[in-house]
């Protein structure tokens, strides 16, 4: 296991959030310390969420159809609730 300067700093500062520690204390390192920068970049890349490079159009279309269906059901239900509550709201 390689221990970096930032690991030591975070341990001494009792930093529990590793990503926050690298973000804050990483700026303390000299800019020309390429080994430390490379180690930090490697560790930070472990926190980055993996993103798909491409999404098939049929997947997008399927999700859009589902979203449209949910929106349609929402509008119908909203109309039902408004119709049901409307007489109750205008009572004196």
Curated annotation (Swiss-Prot):
Q: Does the keyword Transcription regulation apply?
A: no
Membership in a protein family:
Belongs to the 'phage' integrase family.
Q: What is the lineage of its organism?
A: Bacteria, Pseudomonadati, Pseudomonadota, Gammaproteobacteria, Enterobacterales
Q: What is this protein called in UniProt?
A: Putative protein IntG
| BP term (GO), one | DNA recombination
Entry coiled-coil feature ranges: none
Which organism's genome codes for this protein?
Answer: Escherichia coli (strain K12)
The gene designation is intG
UniProt keyword terms in alphabetical order: DNA integration, DNA recombination, Viral genome integration, Virus entry into host cell
Domain of life according to the entry: Bacteria
């Amino acid at each position: 296991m390689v221990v970096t300067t930032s690991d030591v700093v975070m341990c001494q500062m009792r930093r529990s959030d590793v990503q926050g520690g690298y973000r804050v204390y990483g700026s303390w390192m000299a800019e020309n310390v390429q080994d430390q920068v490379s180690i930090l970049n490697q560790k930070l890349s472990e926190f980055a969420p993996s993103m798909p490079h491409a999404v098939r159009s049929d997947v997008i279309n399927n999700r859009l159809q589902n979203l449209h269906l949910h929106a349609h059901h929402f509008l119908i239900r909203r109309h039902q609730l408004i119709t049901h509550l409307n007489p109750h709201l205008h009572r004196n």
